[in-house]
Amino acid sequence: EPPLRLDIKPRSGPIAILIDYEIHDEDLGEFLPLMAERRRIRIRDGARNWNLMRDLENPDIWTESYHVPTWVEYVRHNHRRTQADAEAWDRLLELHRGKTRPRVHRMIERQTIPPTDDIFHKPHTDQH
């Protein structure tokens, strides 16, 4: 469990996870199938909205993103690794060309508008 600077509860969420990898073009033939396996593992363990994105300004940067419903689900998700999961992660670390380990962003989502925003739910009134 990573150290947190926000005081969140186990049921806080949803939690968005983004992991940045630096992958050279010559390694894409191995990286992309590993990420397909990663997607399968994440979904098996309860992740939602899994995505893989490539940075348009720095194409060596690939970002894996997914969501889990709560903080406790994220913690549990990290403890569900099988031997095969660990081997896939180790191989990803070998392909990663960054000076440090892949950067992990753990974020809690917050609504900026109420679920019943007046802009979208105003009744139509005739001004004539």
Regions found by a protein language model. Name each.
Residues 1-17, 29-33, 38, 81, ...:
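Intrinsic disorder in cytosolic terminal tails and internal cytosolic loops
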Residues 4-10, 37, 49, 53-55, ...:
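Short, well-ordered helical secondary-structure segments
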Residues 11-13, 44, 58:
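Solvent-exposed loop and beta-edge segments used for protein-protein assembly and interaction
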Residues 15-22, 51-80:
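Short, well-ordered beta-strand segments in beta-rich or mixed alpha/beta enzyme
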Residues 26-50:
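Short amphipathic alpha-helical segments
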Residues 40-49, 67-104:
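An amphipathic, aromatic/His-enriched active-site/gating alpha helix that lines ligand/cofactor pockets
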Residues 62, 83-86, 119:
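Residue-level signature of transmembrane alpha-helix interfaces in integral membrane proteins
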